[in-house]
């Protein structure tokens, strides 16, 4: 069981409330798209959005502060909007101008392209074939600009308890094949349904678990793992809670997952209105390391610090 201090920094949203909120927001977006006569006046500034987890809120705040400092353009924050497809639809509908996506997610969940596992052995950043494919297709299909990667990858992490990693001497996903029939799994609802998610992963590694995966909000997965309600969860590699709770992320030794480089995506119409944004976003290319984002995630998730304050302090250390 988690002690009282650990419980304080585990988020406990209800998954079904999250799904209901997403559906309601999608309905509102649909009404906006179906009523062209109700044309909105052009904004004097921009709106930056985010998905519904800590890292996304941090990245939205980082972009907002950087843009405000460098250009003086007013920035509205619309964070915690929901999952991948909902935020993508908000971008297409003009409800937001900009958000940070992950290249592997864009390829599989948005573009419905098969995972490109060659990227694991190829170059990273702009040299990555997944990045190049996503950049090309987002421009062609959506009239969106995929800017330079920020410098870190946030891939799916198959996470187990540290004591189990030591007791069973496992460090890679292939190592757990023999134990999987006795193990229970917890996943987020998006990972369960994605083409690069649970079913493809288990087939690729020939994994069979004790029961159907338990689907839950991402804010709950580490709690149920530490509480021994499950034995493995699908988390994110940059989560600060992995180290905080003495958990171990297994190595994807057969390179199932493509690269998931963090990239800002912006409407080209927004770039037309504010061409200076292109230079500001390019300046951030390659400037945020995996260690940087993990420390910021830890500060917000574990020590309960405000994301805006954490970002300001990070920018100060970088001289931004």
Q: Can you say where each PLM-predicted feature lies in the sequence?
A:
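Acidic helix-start/capping segments at beta-turn-to-alpha-helix junctions
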Residues: 78-96, 103-108, 115
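Hydrophobic residues within well-ordered alpha-helices
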Residues: 91-92, 176, 224-226
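Contiguous mixed-secondary-structure segments that line small-molecule binding/active-site clefts
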Residues: 103-203, 207-212, 231, 236-294, ...
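Short, polar/charged alpha-helical segment
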Residues: 54-74, 195, 199-203
